[in-house]
Amino acid sequence: MAHGRRVEKVSALIRKEMSQLLLDGIRDERVASSMVTITEVEVSGDLQHCKIFVSIFGQDPKREEAFSGLQAASGFLRGELGRRLQMRRAPEIVFKLDKGMEKGSSVLDLLGKLEEERKNKDEISEGMNF
């Protein structure tokens, strides 16, 4: 059980430090000019591999640019994490694009449209009742 807690703790620490690095550690303009949010961090049981799920706000070309900037900076970020967390060996970092927020936004848009259509339908049916 202690092993699972350690993985969770390291995951939380990586998320915290990586968020800080995204704010002030990356000088790559592709990443610095984008709004990048870490949505989840998954660390393997042996602490050697780390998947970082990110959400990037913006249009598709800009999003892809920022994501490729993150991937290019993964070696630098791995080294910084190792120094900041004082780990003997920093985990290998893999970035994954999380489209959950995007999907949630589109669902909310659809629900809004349905509500509007329902109101219009109710207004029309009320107008027909004399």
Swiss-Prot record:
Query: Which PANTHER family is this protein grouped with?
Result: RIBOSOME-BINDING FACTOR A, CHLOROPLASTIC-RELATED (PTHR33515:SF1)
- Similarity comment: family membership: Belongs to the RbfA family.
**Binding partners and assembly:** Monomer. Binds 30S ribosomal subunits, but not 50S ribosomal subunits or 70S ribosomes.
Tell me which species this is from. Answer: Prochlorococcus marinus (strain MIT 9211)
Task performed by this protein: One of several proteins that assist in the late maturation steps of the functional core of the 30S ribosomal subunit. Associates with free 30S ribosomal subunits (but not with 30S subunits that are part of 70S ribosomes or polysomes). Required for efficient processing of 16S rRNA. May interact with the 5'-terminal helix region of 16S rRNA.
The record's section on NCBIfam families has:
rbfA (TIGR00082)
- GO biological process annotation, one example: maturation of SSU-rRNA
Q: Where in the cell is it found?
A: Cytoplasm
What UniProt keywords apply to this chain's record, in alphabetical order? Answer: Cytoplasm, Ribosome biogenesis
Protein's name according to its UniProt entry: Ribosome-binding factor A
Gene Ontology cellular-component terms listed: cytosol
Q: Name one GO molecular function term.
A: ribosomal small subunit binding
Q: Which HAMAP family match?
A: RbfA
Identify the PROSITE patterns for this entry: RBFA
Q: Cross-referenced Pfam families, in alphabetical order? A: RBFA (PF02033)
Q: What is its main location?
A: cytoplasm
